[in-house]
Amino acid sequence: MANLKVMDQNGKDSGEVTLNDKVFGIEPNDNVVFEAIIRQRAGKRQGTSKVKNRSAVRGGGKKPWRQKGTGRARQGSIRAPQWRGGGTVFGPTPRSYAYTMPRKQRRLAIKSVLSQKLIDNDLIVLDKLTMSAPKTKELVSMLNSLNADGKVLIVSDDNNVQLSARNLAKVKVVPVNGLNVEDAVNYGKLILTQDAVKKIEEVLA
């Protein structure tokens, strides 16, 4: 079990939290993290591209000329693929690029990222994170007091915190159940509350 310092929103010490080694203390598996990111990005692809094959192109129902006797090559339709304006062969059609990944692998991926954050000292735990009103300036001040520079991922269910971060290019706020591998990898610092740590450990431990 690893102990990590807990801070308040002003950057002052507020005690310690014991992190579960089954979640925050495993050996990071980079291959599984990579596969999880590829799967996540594949699920975001639109897959709406479409071309017309010879049956979908307008026209071409009549045989251009008779089968024999003209000296020209036999043709059955002016919309065959070899014709200008003809249909496309094996072109893209609407499809879903999403695919499944075993639950154990998905959980191993997020646990690997969380463990790596702890190893790199990029994990910050707060006693609580609440805002009375959406104030971007207050959120920036809090991040400065926590020495959270660069790209920061905040895990919080507080709506005011989410609204306060909308205008900050390098800050993203996600709910506890929205924590994902791609965001955790793309953002340097990860800020959790003690409640968020408990919920994450309940699901992943």
UniProtKB/Swiss-Prot annotation:
Keywords: Ribonucleoprotein, Ribosomal protein, RNA-binding, rRNA-binding. GO terms for molecular function: rRNA binding; structural constituent of ribosome. Gene3D superfamilies: 3.40.1370.10. GO terms for cellular component: ribonucleoprotein complex; ribosome. Pfam families: Ribosomal_L4. It comes from the Bacteria. Residues 51-71 have a biased composition (Basic residues). The keyword RNA-binding applies. Part of the 50S ribosomal subunit. One of the primary rRNA binding proteins, this protein initially binds near the 5'-end of the 23S rRNA. It is important during the early stages of 50S assembly. It makes multiple contacts with different domains of the 23S rRNA in the assembled 50S subunit and ribosome. PANTHER family: 50S RIBOSOMAL PROTEIN L4, LARGE RIBOSOMAL SUBUNIT PROTEIN UL4M. Belongs to the universal ribosomal protein uL4 family. NCBIfam families: rplD_bact (TIGR03953). This is Large ribosomal subunit protein uL4. It comes from Lactobacillus acidophilus (strain ATCC 700396 / NCK56 / N2 / NCFM).
